[in-house]
């Protein structure tokens, strides 16, 4: 009943599975009234007397994958997950690379938007190079917000290749030991799992590898 009355959702595909993702809320005034009846108090950060440190933004611009516009126009592209280029079948006596093929089919407005976002982040080699450069630029603790599990796995591989301790907070995994005890750790946080709550103030640098569907998760993540 709560979801039906107060939650706005849309169906999205994550790692090959379809699920409902929260995109916003409705009947908010009614929800606040109901919660207030049970003792809830609503305050802004300023009203609560919380002073957040000044934020300094460093924009690192990267181009989308070269395959982005081809997909956007054709609504289809086959990605080679090994090199993030366009897939070309390579088979010989010893085997083939067919297992590396990822077909992106934008046959609906939702799938078209989803895969377009992935081509800007998950399947964009330039993003990973920019991430590597950022990690090499500091030995401080880093928080990295991401969307898709495959993004995290690729980023984690880069971090471990640079001998950086890794922590993960996602819907499937919670391991924050490196974050707590290693000054040069990198903590990967899935938006849905950690953007709305959690205290990560041991770190003072955040990397947004890719942006979420809606602005609310991004805005809340800045207060972690």
Located regions from the model:
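Short, solvent-exposed loop/turn segments at secondary-structure junctions
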Residues: 7-9, 40, 67-69, 121, ...
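Short His-Asn-centered micro-motif
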Residues: 25, 32, 54, 145-147, ...
């Amino acid at each position: 009943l709560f979801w039906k009355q107060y939650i706005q959702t849309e169906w999205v595909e994550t790692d090959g599975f379809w699920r409902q993702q929260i995109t916003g809320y409705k009947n908010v005034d009614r929800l606040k009234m109901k919660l207030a009846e049970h003792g809830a108090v609503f305050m802004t950060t300023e009203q609560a007397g919380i002073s957040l440190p000044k934020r300094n933004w460093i924009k690192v611009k990267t181009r989308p994958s070269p395959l982005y516009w081809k997909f956007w126009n054709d609504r289809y592209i086959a990605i080679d997950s090994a090199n993030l280029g366009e897939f070309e079948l390579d088979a010989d006596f010893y085997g083939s690379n067919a297992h590396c093929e990822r077909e992106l089919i934008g046959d609906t407005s939702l799938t078209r938007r989803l895969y377009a976002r992935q081509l800007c982040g998950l399947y964009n080699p330039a993003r990973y190079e920019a991430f590597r450069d950022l990690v090499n630029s500091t030995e401080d603790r880093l928080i990295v917000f991401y969307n898709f599990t495959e993004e995290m796995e690729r980023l984690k591989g880069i971090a471990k290749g640079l001998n950086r301790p890794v922590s993960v907070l996602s819907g499937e995994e919670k391991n924050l030991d490196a974050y707590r005890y290693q000054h040069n750790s990198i903590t990967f946080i899935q938006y849905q799992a950690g953007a709305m709550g959690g205290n990560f103030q041991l770190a003072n640098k955040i990397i947004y590898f890719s942006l979420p569907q809606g602005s609310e998760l991004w805005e809340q993540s800045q207060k972690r």
